[in-house]
Amino acid sequence: MKRPRSRLWYDGLENTPHRVYLRAIGFTSDDFQKPLIAVVAAWSEAGPCNFNVLPGSLRVKEGVRSAGGVPLAVPTIVVNDGINMGTPGMRYSLISRELIADTIEAQVASHGFDGWVGIGGCDKTQPGIMMAMARLDLPSIYIYGGTAEHGVLDGETVTVQSAFEAVGAYLKGLIDEERLYEIEKAAMPTPGTCQGLFTANTMAILAEALGLSPLGSASPPATSSERARELARAGALAVGLVETGLTPRRILTYEAFYNAIVTLMAISGSTNAVLHLLAIAREAGVKLALDDFDEASRKVPVIAALAPAGKYTMVDLHNVGGAPVILRKLLDRGLLYGEAVTVEGVEIGKLLSKWEPRTDYNILYDFDKPYKPHAGLRILRGSLAPRGAVMKIGASGILKFKGAAKVFDSEEEAFKAIERGYVEEGDVVVVRYVGPKGAPGMPEMLKITAAIVGAGLGEKVALITDGRFSGATRGVMVGHAAPEAAVGGPIALVENGDEIVIDGEKGTLDVLLGGDELARRRDKWSPPPLPKQGLLRKYAKLVTQADEGAVTH
């Protein structure tokens, strides 16, 4: 079997000391003749999303061995997004994406691996692994650790989204503490990632659309036997990739990224996917810009009623066929590049011929009768965000909003204002200095958005920020405003009472101020100081703006 890299580390008399190290952990002479496969486990017990990744890595190793390879497990880090919402820890979420890519590069590049498998779960582990795949360009495959089962309370589906929104309902007096506690206990009955079409499940589906994951591998729940089989299959496929020499950059063409973008629009996926696809494309050397997302958003309606746009979860999608059923619909509509190659070594169009298109008008809809007549996301530009912003419209359906600004320089300020009833119907809440450099780390605003929705203001108040949104976000929400406040973007110049106009149909985002007034305010503006030390300071100095994927190189 082929061993393009490991032979350079472990063959020959001069590499005798290297073999000593592996014999110390149980290698036999036969093992040195087999492909060496890294099993990169983004594992952590600090939350449910990646809790099952370590035992899952054992399944991957079984698959590697079954195909004639030798697996070695190596770790990478995890920051659990949900647990860090609304805390200082959320600043480390997006930063962890870069750290994951960097740590994988360091480990896989330096130990002579012939190929590797990355196992992810929570939001940033997935794009971090995919960025490393593109950067290293070694035979590799991404496999998802799987979603959690949804809970049931009084016959109704509940998820972690229900818990976040219940806090807002409690603060508004709409539910009591006992009901809040019942939701807390019921919302997440098993390990796995957050259950709706939030960032983790969005990225797992997009990994299939990109061709980096086997078709059908995104939707099996984390604790299911199907998930175990998918993990083992990924290990075996990795050995095959070493043999054929198929690498990520042959898969990650512009056409593959376009397939992912139209899928994102059709499922009303997380706004975070825009950042992540831009970042992965940069690693792959593919030119991708917000204009590509804008173009796709004007062609594709939402055809899946998945939470938060609808009420169904990833497990529900799995029960009707999973991501390939949606991809087949896109292919049949002429919206997917069927000739794009996948990690299975076969064009995606040929693979999708095995899946029958399905419509039930509960979870899955048709293009002629879509769930929503527009795409899930829209790109906005204007005087408030000259380089672009991302509007999530799949959940609310509201494309236009005009109101007076209420401005906050932190998430905590905004949350306290909502808590005390300061935010009212018709307001445009502006949360700034929470961008890539400003926070730093571009934290997600789920605590605020959930409080707004829970208080019954989801479609009556708009939120604009240079930060990010959780995939669980719904309401009238515009994020990723670029340039951000910390570098002097127009969002830094907005004052309380300024009229702001959001127009998702035209794709515009404007503050109704003259150029002279903006210039006067800019003369008085000064940049905030950088963090004094550590990782946050390093990140703030290196990171690019959101329209470039918020990357560090």
From Swiss-Prot:
Binds 1 [2Fe-2S] cluster per subunit. This cluster acts as a Lewis acid cofactor. Its EC number is 4.2.1.9. The keyword Lyase applies. It is an enzyme of class 4 (lyase). NCBIfam families: ilvD, PRK00911.1. The active site is at 470 (proton acceptor). The modification N6-carboxylysine is found at residue 124. It catalyses: (2R)-2,3-dihydroxy-3-methylbutanoate = 3-methyl-2-oxobutanoate + H2O; (2R,3R)-2,3-dihydroxy-3-methylpentanoate = (S)-3-methyl-2-oxopentanoate + H2O. Its cofactor is [2Fe-2S] cluster; Mg(2+). [2Fe-2S] cluster binds at residues 49, 122, 194. This is Dihydroxy-acid dehydratase. Belongs to the IlvD/Edd family. One of its GO terms (biological process) is L-valine biosynthetic process. Pathway: Amino-acid biosynthesis; L-isoleucine biosynthesis; L-isoleucine from 2-oxobutanoate: step 3/4; Amino-acid biosynthesis; L-valine biosynthesis; L-valine from pyruvate: step 3/4. Mg(2+) binds at residues 81, 123-124, 444. Functions in the biosynthesis of branched-chain amino acids. Catalyzes the dehydration of (2R,3R)-2,3-dihydroxy-3-methylpentanoate (2,3-dihydroxy-3-methylvalerate) into 2-oxo-3-methylpentanoate (2-oxo-3-methylvalerate) and of (2R)-2,3-dihydroxy-3-methylbutanoate (2,3-dihydroxyisovalerate) into 2-oxo-3-methylbutanoate (2-oxoisovalerate), the penultimate precursor to L-isoleucine and L-valine, respectively. The keyword Metal-binding applies. Homodimer. One of its GO terms (molecular function) is magnesium ion binding. It holds the Pfam family ILV_EDD_C. Keywords: 2Fe-2S, Amino-acid biosynthesis, Branched-chain amino acid biosynthesis, Iron, Iron-sulfur, Lyase, Magnesium, Metal-binding.
